[in-house]
Structure formats: C-alpha cells, structure tokens
Regions:
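Transmembrane alpha-helices and adjacent helix-loop boundaries
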Residues: 3, 9-378
C-alpha cells in the first residue's frame, strides 16, 4: 500500500460511543432554566412597586371594560330576531334597532325601492379597492375596473339612463359617498403627490417654488376650510360648468391629500443617497430611467408607513363632508335615531359605523404592510 493511502480510523466501540455522545451534546441546545414565580412576576409586571401598581390598575380597568362591553353587547342585549319592543326591558344593546335601521345608515335617504343601486355601487368600489390594494390583477385591469366603477357610480346613483329614475345629489348618502370620496380622492392623490414631490425636489425655481407654496398652503389650513372652498367657491369660479357638491368636494380632497402625499414621498426621495443617482447614470441610464427603476421603488418603500398613515387619516377625515351639506355614514347614523322612540339607541348606531371604519382602515393598514414587505423583497 502506498504512503498516500489514508489508513482507516480504528477505535474501540467504547471510544466511538463516547465520541458520539460528546458530539451530540455539543450540537444539542440546552433547555433554558425554568423561571421562578418571582422572575416571571418581575418580567410581567415590572421591577418596582410603582410599575407593578400601574400595571395592575391598567389590567383591572381593562378587564372591567371588557366585562362591561360583553355584558352590553351579548349577555343583556336584545337579540336581532326579537321584537324591538323587547328593548324597553333590556339593559343591553338593542340589535333589532340596528337590523331595522341598517339600510338607512348605509344608504341614507336614497329612494327605498332603488336601494339596490347604491348597493351595487358600494360592492364595485369595495371590490376595486381590494383588487388595487392587494394587487389581485394587473394595472391594466385595475384601470379598466376603476373606469367602469366610476361610470357605474355616476349612472346608477344619478339615474336617467336604462329607464332608471333620476335621484338628486342631495339624496346620495351613506356608504357609497364615503367609498367614492375616500377611495377615489386617495387614489388620485398619489400621482398628484408624486408630481408635487418631484417638483419640490427640482433644482428649477420655476417648479420648486410653486410646488412648495402649494404644499405648505394646503398643509397649513384645516380640511374644513378646503371643503368650504370646494363646495361653495369652486362652483362659482367654474360657473360655465354645473359642478355638483360631491364632485367639487372630490376635486379639493384630491389636492388636499396630494399635498400630504407629496411630503411623504419627498421624505422617501431624500433618504436615497446621491451616490445611487451617480452610479445608475454611470451605467448609461437616462434620468427618467434612474428615477423609475432605481430611485422611486426605494423611495416608495421608505415612505410606505407614512403613506399608509396618511391614507387612514384621509379616509377617516372624509366624515367632515357633513359640515358642507353632504352625508356620509356618521351623518346617516344620526338620522337613524332621530325619532323619539329610537333616541336611546344612538350607541348601537355609532358602534355599527365604527366597526365599518375599523374594517376598512384595517384593510388599508394590511395592504400597506404587504406593499412594504413586497418592495423589501424585490
């Protein structure tokens, strides 16, 4: 046998077993020691007496609120299938009231026999919002879907076509108005905000200063003032065109939200190192290609949490349209308990509206988190 041949490792069975046990012990993670009650208590409630006292008080208040809410909503509540008269003897929620008044809360004063029209419109807007937020379809299908949804909104809500009765704008209330103003204004605010952010970041004074003034003015005045301008002043400025209150409110909301979106995107643009511009330009990319392929994806990823917060705040602020004569869910909820026999059930109406807002804003938050994760992986 040659010298280069390796000789076999000859060990006794006892030595081989000991070696195996050593290797197994080295690779097996030891279990952490069990915490004593004192250690668990300090980790859960704090190290000092003050921290423990505060935590116990907060826990007690939380448990009390949970119990009171459960008692009101379930234990002492009147079931939805019971007669509304049974609510008089109940100490909890009156769900028959909500079952009876839900159509009024959702669709307001829209004619009763035609309430299928705002129902179809709301379903289309919700479907397109979900398809856009969660990217279920390509952008071409999104554009086609939004155009179709907006056409349906105008035709079904207003009527006059397909032998539909004409419904004046004053009777467009509730959920379809909230979805229309909330989703469309925020969707249109994204390109407006992007253009404003790019103009404000520009070195050309002709673009920089007008964009800066526009953004700071809109961010410096309250939303109510902007809505008053849109509903009462803007129609006078475009007197040649008949502009209804809901479309006037939509126009000013687009630019109002666009100003906040612009600042969110500008912060994302400023977080990108200048060296990335120079490196991409050195590879032969044009400025538009650098912006589209290198800078904007990173800027949007960086600004996604701020954009999500702006979207949620803007969607909730849509309720302020009630101050200019338009009626969203909060306003129609007040209509539902306007009669004397229902006035004691205002809480049920507002809980119903709050659940709707919570679900819709939760979807926006989920979509923002998913977009941020998707951009991070790409």
């Amino acid at each position: 046998m040659s010298q280069n041949d390796s000789s076999p490792d000859i060990r006794s069975p006892r030595a081989a077993l000991d070696s195996s046990l050593v290797n197994t012990a080295a690779t097996t993670a030891s279990k952490p020691p069990r915490k004593t009650f004192r250690q668990w208590w300090r980790a859960s409630f704090g190290q000092t007496r003050t921290a423990v006292l505060i935590n116990l008080v907060v826990m007690g208040v939380t448990l009390w609120l949970v119990w009171k809410s459960l008692s009101w909503a379930v234990l002492f509540a009147t079931a939805p299938w019971q007669d509304p008269a049974a609510c008089q003897q109940s100490a909890g929620a009156c769900w028959p009231f909500l079952l009876e008044k839900a159509p009024l809360i959702l669709f307001g004063t829209f004619p009763y026999d035609d309430r299928w029209r705002p129902l179809v419109v709301s379903a289309c807007l919700l479907l397109m919002s979900a398809a856009t937020l969660f990217q279920w379809v390509t952008w071409k299908w999104q554009v086609a879907g939004w155009v179709t949804s907006l056409m349906l909104f105008s035709l079904l809500m207003g009527g006059g076509a397909w032998d539909l009765s004409i419904v004046p704008n004053a009777q467009w209330n509730g959920l379809p108005v909230l979805l229309f103003l909330g989703t469309v204004s925020l969707a249109a605010a994204l390109p407006v905000g992007l253009m404003l952010a790019l103009c404000r970041n520009s070195n050309l004074n002709l673009l920089h200063w007008p964009a800066t003034v526009f953004i700071e003015v809109l961010r410096g005045i309250p939303m109510v003032a902007v809505l008053f301008f849109g509903v009462f002043v803007l129609p006078l400025l475009v007197g040649a065109f008949k502009l209804s209150a809901i479309y006037a409110a939509l126009i000013v909301l687009v630019f109002f939200h666009g100003a906040y979106v612009a600042e969110d995107l500008r912060s994302g643009l400023q977080s990108i190192p200048r060296g990335q511009w120079e490196a991409a330009s050195a590879m032969g990319l044009r400025k538009t290609q650098v912006l589209r392929l290198v800078i904007l994806p990173q800027a949007i990823q960086s600004a996604t949490p701020a954009l999500t917060n702006t979207a949620i705040g803007g969607f909730k602020d849509t309720s302020l349209i009630v101050l200019v004569g338009l009626h969203d869910l909060v306003s129609t909820a007040k209509m539902s308990f306007a009669e004397a026999q229902w006035q004691r059930y205002a809480l049920e109406a507002y809980v119903f509206v709050g659940v709707i807002f919570f679900v819709l804003n939760g979807l926006i938050a989920m979509a923002g988190k998913r977009l941020e994760s998707r951009l991070h992986h790409h």
